[in-house]
C-alpha cells in the first residue's frame, strides 16, 4: 500500500487514542480528522488494488469529488433547516442537529466544509475497494429499463426533491435520500455518463453492489465515530426515533445505501457538464 495509506491509518488510530484521552482539540475536530485519515487509508488501498486513486493518478478528479461533496451536502443542509434564514429556533434542523459547535463563524465554516469534503471521497473510495475485491465478479441477468420507466423515475424524482422544500415536515426525510437518484440517474444513463443503470444492461452488478455496500460501511463508521466525538450530531425523527444504534435511529441505517447511489448520480450529473475535451481521465468509479 502507498505511504499515504499508512499515514491515513495512523491518523485514524491516533485520533481515536487522543479522543479516548479526552484531548479537547481532537475531540472537537474529531469528525473531519478521523475521516481525513479514513479517506487517505482507502485511497492507498484503492491505489494498491486498482493502480488508480484520487491522490496518485486522478488528482483533478479527487478535487472535483471533494468540491461536489461540499456543495451537495450544503444542499442537504438546506433540506434539513429550510427556514434557517429566519434565525432563532427556525435554524434548528428537522432531522439532525449539531452540538458543541465552534462559536467562531469563520472557523465553524472551515470545520463544516472540511468534514463535508470527506463524504463523497469516503463513499466512492470504499466502493472502489469493494468493487475490486468482494464484488469483482458480481453479475446479474441483463436488464434494460424501458423509456417509460425512465421517464416515470425522473418525474417521481423531481417531485421527491421538490416536496420537502415546499412542504416542511419531518416525515418527508426519506424523499431526500432517494429523490436525486431517481431524478438524475436516468439522465446520466441516457446521456452515456457513468451509470449503474447502464451497467445492469450488460449484466454487471459490481458497481451497484459496491456502492450500496460502501454506503452501509460508511454509514456505520459515521455513526460509530460521531457517537464518541465532542462536536457531534443527533437525530430527531418521528418514527421509531427512540430505538437507536449509537445516535442513529435504527430505520435510518436503511438510508445509507440509497444515499450513496444518490451521491454517485449527483456527482456524475455535475461532472457531465464539463467539456468533453477537458482532458479528464475516465472516472475512478
Predicted regions and their residues:
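Aromatic-rich, lipid-facing transmembrane alpha helices and their immediate juxtamembrane interface loops
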Residues: 1-285
Amino acid at each position: 500500500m502507498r505511504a499515504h495509506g499508512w499515514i491515513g491509518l495512523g491518523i485514524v488510530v491516533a485520533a481515536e487514542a487522543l479522543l479516548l484521552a479526552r484531548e479537547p482539540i481532537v475531540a472537537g475536530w474529531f469528525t473531519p480528522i478521523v475521516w481525513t485519515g479514513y479517506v487517505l487509508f482507502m485511497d492507498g488501498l484503492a491505489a494498491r488494488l486498482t493502480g488508480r486513486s484520487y491522490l496518485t493518478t486522478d488528482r483533478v478528479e479527487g478535487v472535483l469529488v471533494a468540491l461536489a461533496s461540499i456543495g451537495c451536502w450544503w444542499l442537504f443542509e438546506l433540506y434539513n433547516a429550510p427556514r434557517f434564514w429566519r434565525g432563532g429556533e427556525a435554524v434548528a434542523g428537522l432531522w439532525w442537529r449539531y452540538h458543541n459547535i465552534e462559536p467562531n463563524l469563520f472557523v465553524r465554516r472551515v470545520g463544516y466544509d472540511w468534514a463535508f469534503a470527506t463524504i463523497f471521497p469516503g463513499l466512492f473510495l470504499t466502493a472502489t475497494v469493494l468493487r475490486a475485491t468482494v464484488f469483482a465478479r458480481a453479475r446479474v441477468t441483463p436488464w434494460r429499463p424501458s423509456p417509460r420507466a425512465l421517464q416515470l423515475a425522473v418525474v417521481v424524482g423531481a417531485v421527491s426533491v421538490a416536496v420537502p422544500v415546499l412542504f416542511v415536515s419531518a416525515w418527508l426525510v426519506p424523499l431526500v435520500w432517494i429523490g436525486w437518484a431517481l431524478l438524475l440517474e436516468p439522465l446520466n444513463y441516457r446521456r452515456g455518463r457513468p451509470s449503474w443503470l447502464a451497467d445492469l444492461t450488460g449484466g454487471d452488478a459490481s458497481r451497484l453492489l459496491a456502492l450500496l455496500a460502501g454506503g452501509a460501511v460508511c454509514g456505520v463508521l459515521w455513526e460509530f465515530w460521531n457517537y464518541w466525538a465532542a462536536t457531534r450530531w443527533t437525530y430527531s425523527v418521528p418514527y421509531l426515533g427512540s430505538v437507536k444504534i449509537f445516535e442513529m435511529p435504527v430505520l435510518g441505517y436503511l438510508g445509507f445505501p440509497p444515499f450513496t447511489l444518490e451521491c454517485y448520480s449527483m456527482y456524475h450529473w455535475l461532472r457531465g457538464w464539463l467539456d468533453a475535451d477537458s482532458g479528464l481521465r475516465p472516472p475512478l468509479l
